[in-house]
């Protein structure tokens, strides 16, 4: 790979004032939580619950690896956008400086991944509403009709002001409801296998159980939770808050921590409830009906309602924001791959931006809610994990190169040796998980069929 010719520029100054009090910092937080709730779509919920139900705590180490990898990965993405010497506030610009072909390469991959991910979010949200409203619409077309409702609400949000503020508020509410719901479920369980929990933090693969292989659950958890292409959306959320330039690095790190903590708690709660209730009972989780049965056995008649509320909130905090975020990434790739930057100041100025966002990433995903489409669990375990894993290795390698080169970063801000080693290990884990997902994909499909 060869870098393009570089020219250092002055970082533009931004008038947004940094907070000076604890209350000020807390009120400033938002991008990290919005991003975390964007991540915390059904991929996390389903991956953690299926792993806990089918394998107990034996694969808990994959969750730790996934969340640590994600946290560091996002942090270094933010580091480049805040502390590069060129004034780039678009991560795609950095990838282009590593290799001219990256924007087009990423654009093609992300376009495919985004559609699969949006389909999983829309189906999850529609299933949640369908179940919450007593299966209104019938078994055949009910989920499809509720998907139209979600699409309509999303389109309405697009024409309202302060979209980001609405998403930030919804993310805060959703995180509280989800933590509260599964904490209540955990209290109702009444027991916790602490020794099993601690043992699950050590590496190892158990015997296969349920419809999904242990190795496939392990790598899909790492891929779906740790290596999501949604990691690339964080700079866009920072720009929406006006965080441009190195002075926001400390605030950004605290914000990311603020967002990742509830994500960790929610994932552990999903996992623990499933491990304590389903694992060892002779049952497994293969579809959304099994998820509902699990919550019924724990909480009683209110259990499924809590589950469907969580599933709806997890998907709906993701579907609108990722339609814009993914589309922005794709157009940024197209923008920097050719000469469109000579015609439009930003990728969002392209008149095709809104058209593609609406047609491809809001309306087209409706097809996954039609009769005969894959169920919620199958779509997330097989579809989302495979799609996201394909982007992970080049994403990590490019990030390693751009943040480690002194010619790319402000003086003293290039990765030190320990940071290079850390990113190198994360990159190797990403490459391994991609290899294992691809290697086991067809074997897993044949096993299910």
Q: In which residue ranges do the predicted regions lie?
A:
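Membrane-interface "cap" regions at the ends of multi-pass membrane proteins
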Residues: 1-45, 217, 244-247, 251-258
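Hydrophobic alpha-helical segments and their helix-loop junctions in multi-pass secondary transporters
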Residues: 176-208, 215-235, 395-408, 433-445
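Transmembrane alpha-helical segments of multi-pass small-molecule transport proteins
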Residues: 133-160, 176-183, 348-367, 392-398
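Membrane-interface loop-to-helix entry segments
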Residues: 158-189, 385-391, 415-420, 425-428
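Juxtamembrane transmembrane-helix boundary signature
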Residues: 35, 62-96, 105-119, 321
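Extracellular/periplasmic helix-exit of transmembrane alpha-helices
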Residues: 72-83, 238, 261-290
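Hydrophobic transmembrane alpha-helices that form the core helical bundles
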Residues: 102-137, 315-333, 376-377, 431, ...
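Membrane-water interface regions at transmembrane-helix termini and the short interhelical loops
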Residues: 127, 131-136, 151-174, 185-186, ...
């Amino acid at each position: 790979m060869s870098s393009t010719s570089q020219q250092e520029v002055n970082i533009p100054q931004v008038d947004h004032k940094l907070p000076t009090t604890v209350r000020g910092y807390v009120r400033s937080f938002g991008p990290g939580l919005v991003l975390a709730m964007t991540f915390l779509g059904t991929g996390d919920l389903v991956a953690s619950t299926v792993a806990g139900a089918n394998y107990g705590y034996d694969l808990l180490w994959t969750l730790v690896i996934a969340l640590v990898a994600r946290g560091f990965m996002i942090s270094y993405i933010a580091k480049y956008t805040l502390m590069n010497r060129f004034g780039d506030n678009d991560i795609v610009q950095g990838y282009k400086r590593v290799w001219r072909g990256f924007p087009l390469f990423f654009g093609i991959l992300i376009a495919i991944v985004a559609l699969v991910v949006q389909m999983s979010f829309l189906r999850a949200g529609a299933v949640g509403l369908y179940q919450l409203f007593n299966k209104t619409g019938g078994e055949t077309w009910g989920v499809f009709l509720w998907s139209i409702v979600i699409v309509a609400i999303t389109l309405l949000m697009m024409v309202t002001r302060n979209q980001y503020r609405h998403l930030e508020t919804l993310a805060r509410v959703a995180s509280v409801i989800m933590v509260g719901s599964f904490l209540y479920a955990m209290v109702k369980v009444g027991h916790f296998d602490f020794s099993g929990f601690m043992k699950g933090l050590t590496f190892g693969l158990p015997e296969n159980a349920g419809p999904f292989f242990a190795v496939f659950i392990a790598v899909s958890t790492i891929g779906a939770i740790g290596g999501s292409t949604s990691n690339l959306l964080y700079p866009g959320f920072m720009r929406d808050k006006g965080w441009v330039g190195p002075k926001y690095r400390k605030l950004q790190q605290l914000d990311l921590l603020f967002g990742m903590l509830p994500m960790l708690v929610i994932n552990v709660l999903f996992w623990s409830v499933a491990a304590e209730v389903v694992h060892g009972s002779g049952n497994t989780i293969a579809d959304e009906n099994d998820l509902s049965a699990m919550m019924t056995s724990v909480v009683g008649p209110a259990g499924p309602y809590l589950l469907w509320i969580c599933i709806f909130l997890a998907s709906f905090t993701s579907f609108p924001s990722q339609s814009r975020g993914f589309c922005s990434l794709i157009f940024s790739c197209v923008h920097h791959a050719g000469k469109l930057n000579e015609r439009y100041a930003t990728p969002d100025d392209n008149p095709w931006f809104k058209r593609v966002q609406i047609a491809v990433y809001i309306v087209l995903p409706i097809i996954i809610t039609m009769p005969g489409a894959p169920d919620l669990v199958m779509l997330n375990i097989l579809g989302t994990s495979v799609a996201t894993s394909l982007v992970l290795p080049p994403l990590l390698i490019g990030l390693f190169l751009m943040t480690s080169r002194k010619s790319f970063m402000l003086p003293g801000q290039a990765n030190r040796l320990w940071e290079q080693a850390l990113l190198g290990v994360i990159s190797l884990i990403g490459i391994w998980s991609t290899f294992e997902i691809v290697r086991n994909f067809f074997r897993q499909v044949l096993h299910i069929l």
